[in-house]
Amino acid sequence: MSYNFDNDQNHYYFNNKNSLPIIFIHGVGLNQQMWKPQIEFFKNNSFITYDLLGHGKTPFKKPNLSMENFTNQLSNIVNYLKIEKFNLIGFSIGSLIAIEFASKYENYLNSLTLISTTYQRTAEERQNVIDRVNLAKKNMPISQMAMKRWFSDKYLAVSYTHLTLPTMIGV
């Protein structure tokens, strides 16, 4: 597997099999490695994975990022690779980026798939997301944050304490 950087220092992988590509957008605090099971499944198809701004090996460009920055990042990668049409899959914040991209650049899309997206978060939910981003910036393993969010302390103390997020999602 060969990973590359484009002119904007976006870290990506393009598996070009001369078919309509699938572009995968990961969630906050993760990187393109979260798509390993899907990469294996789609290895005979064209696909692109990439690290969002400030994630994985793609650096932050600005101290305060907006949805527009993430949407422009995807647009720049698509243009850099000269892709005219593709299937887009987003997970979590990747879904929000995919929605924003679709609203601006619908002519690029063959299909749009949203996984674990959100809609009309409360003020408390928005603050929780900001808190998770701040924790991720401090290098707290995202799997620990997710486990604490998904399971009670009692459950984690008694059951499956050996599991991490990668083993739970089959990575």
Residue positions per predicted region:
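Single conserved hydrophobic/aromatic residue that forms the stacking wall/gate
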Residues: H162-V171
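Short, well-ordered alpha-helices that flank and scaffold nucleotide-derived cofactor binding pockets
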Residues: P37-E40, N76, S103-N107
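Flexible "cap/lid" loop of the alpha/beta hydrolase fold
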Residues: I99-K104, L109-N139
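Conserved alpha/beta-hydrolase catalytic His-Asp/Glu region
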Residues: A123-N128, K138-L163
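Active-site loop/oxyanion-hole signature of alpha/beta-hydrolase fold enzymes
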Residues: P37, I48-I89
